[in-house]
């Protein structure tokens, strides 16, 4: 599937036409439109959805689809990992990704994940439903359709896919879109907050909790000024120190011991800022939050 590609993507894909690879090219219209076009022409029992940028580990596809031997499983998600990081900033984003993977594995043990890894997952063809044109989180909307049809969404940690490490500048708009998509999900799937959601507690704590976190932190800072003096100084001072470290991180050189602490504070702060900016989806068209991720250029 080529969604208005302007580089050599189409030509490269065409080189594999003799090996059964079929290229479907559509005018640029966003990922939902591209996926909907693909759903109209693909067949088979299992759909494998991948992005072109990531690198799949050998045997990862076999490991991924093996789980469909369980008839209760509707979606299986691979595990995204980042390649070696060059900076503390990239390392912290990689650690955040590992934490996300851990959460998904734990949710699988309970029942189901709340979505899938968009660059590498598989779904039973009969469960894949078309996307509304304004959808921000296709990798949540499509899997959750299977979830509400009574199937499980599970993680397969042995089906690994690799991506290049990213900077906070690259990650920020993507995180804004992801968190804004959580607001949008409440409109697309209002049953998420109803009794039909067998993962209700997990959705509220995992998805909605992240949206509320910056507001709770702001309330914590303000309320700290009403504490007794000895506690007020400690609580306010600790919070301001954390925000201060996040602020100065950009001016500190790599290799400085303090950088490991300030980079972590900055990463956390940027994620909180992204959660605040995500509320923009309530006031602007959702597709204005789409920004293509720039692929880092590998050095020879």
Model-derived features: where do they sit?
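A conserved acidic beta->alpha catalytic loop
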Residues: 2-11, 27-29, 54
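Membrane-embedded multi-pass helical conduit in multi-pass membrane proteins
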Residues: 210-286
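Short, conserved alpha-helix that lines the donor NDP-sugar binding/gating region
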Residues: 10-14, 31-40, 143-144
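Long helical/loop segments within the catalytic core of UDP-sugar-dependent glycosyltransferases
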Residues: 27-28, 32-34, 38-40, 44, ...
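Short aromatic/hydrophobic "clamp" motif used to bind/position activated sugar donors
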Residues: 47
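Active-site acidic Asp-centered loop
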Residues: 3, 50-52, 132, 157
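Catalytic donor/gating beta->alpha subdomain of glycosyltransferases that bind UDP-sugars
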Residues: 68-100, 133-138, 142-203, 267, ...
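Membrane-proximal intrinsically disordered regions of secretory-pathway and membrane-system proteins
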Residues: 288-300
């Amino acid at each position: 599937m080529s969604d208005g590609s302007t580089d050599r993507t189409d030509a490269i894909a065409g080189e594999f036409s003799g090996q059964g690879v079929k290229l479907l090219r559509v005018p640029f219209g966003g990922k939902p439109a591209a996926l909907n076009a693909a759903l109209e022409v693909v067949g088979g029992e299992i759909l494998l959805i991948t992005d072109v940028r990531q690198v799949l580990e050998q045997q990862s596809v076999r490991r991924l689809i093996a789980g469909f031997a369980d008839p209760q499983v509707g979606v299986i998600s691979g595990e995204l990992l980042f390649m070696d990081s060059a900076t503390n900033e990239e390392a912290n984003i990689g650690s955040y990704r590992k934490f996300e993977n851990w959460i998904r594995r734990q949710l699988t043990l309970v029942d189901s994940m709340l979505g899938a890894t968009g660059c590498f997952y598989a779904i039973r063809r009969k469960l894949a439903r078309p996307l509304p044109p304004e959808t921000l989180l296709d990798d949540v909307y499509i899997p959750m359709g299977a979830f509400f049809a009574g199937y499980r969404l599970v993680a397969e940690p042995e089906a690994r896919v690799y991506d290049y490490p990213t900077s906070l500048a690259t990650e920020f708009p993507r995180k804004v879109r992801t968190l804004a998509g959580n607001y949008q999900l409440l409109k697309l799937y209002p049953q998420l907050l109803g009794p039909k959601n067998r993962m209700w507690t997990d959705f509220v704590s995992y998805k909605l909790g992240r949206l509320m976190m910056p507001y709770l932190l702001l309330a914590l800072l303000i309320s700290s000024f009403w504490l007794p003096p000895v506690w007020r100084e400690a609580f306010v001072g600790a919070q301001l120190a954390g925000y201060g470290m996040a602020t100065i991180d950009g001016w500190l050189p790599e290799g400085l011991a303090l950088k490991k602490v300030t980079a972590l504070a900055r990463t956390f702060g940027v994620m909180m800022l992204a959660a605040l900016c995500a509320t923009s989806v309530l006031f602007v068209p959702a597709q204005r939050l789409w920004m293509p991720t720039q692929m880092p250029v590998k050095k020879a």
